[in-house]
Amino acid sequence: MRITEVENSEEKAAIVKEVLADLPEWFGLPDSTQAYIDESRELPLWAAFDNEKLLGFVTLKETSNSTTEIHCMGVKKAYHHQGIGKALQSALEESVAGKYDFLQVKTVDEGHYDEYDATIRFYESVGFKRLEVFPTLWDEWNPCLVMVKYVG
């Protein structure tokens, strides 16, 4: 497996579209999925490949001069639990080391959907801590959990 930072905006959008199409349990709302695809064109993106086969990606978005956020991350279902997400996370952290103090991610709070409960466990496994829940940031059915990790 190799992880590469992708520079071409159309390639970024194609990568995000392909991976998110494989993850409807997490990315099943067409408008928000399209927003991730469109926004990825302008964001730093790392992709994981096995030879030429796309496995997953992660995008990054600066939120302040001390914090950057995992904007979107996805690994195709067939490749879950094989260390790809952790490898993407590691590549991301290497690239932000010395530039930011904190890395954050937003996800749906625990206890609402099994898929997002698994997402929380993944982020905890790579060192993220639960910071705060915003019960209605997205809507009342999807309370937003903010998780953070010190990377400075």
Predicted regions and their residues:
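Short acidic/glycine-enriched loop/turn segments that link adjacent beta-strands
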Residues: S66, W138-P143
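Conserved beta-strand in the GNAT
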Residues: A47, K53-K61, E69-G74
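Conserved active-site alpha-helix within GNAT-family acetyltransferase domains
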Residues: E110-E132, W141
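Conserved acetyl-CoA-binding loop-helix of GNAT-fold acetyltransferases
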Residues: V75, H81-E94, A118-R121
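Conserved acetyl-CoA binding element of GNAT-fold acetyltransferases
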Residues: S66-K77, Q104-K106
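Short hydrophobic/aromatic beta-strand or adjacent loop that forms the aromatic wall/cage
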Residues: L43, N142-V146
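Conserved GNAT acetyl-CoA-binding A-motif
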Residues: V96-G111
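Short amphipathic alpha-helix that is part of the acyltransferase structural core
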Residues: M1-P30
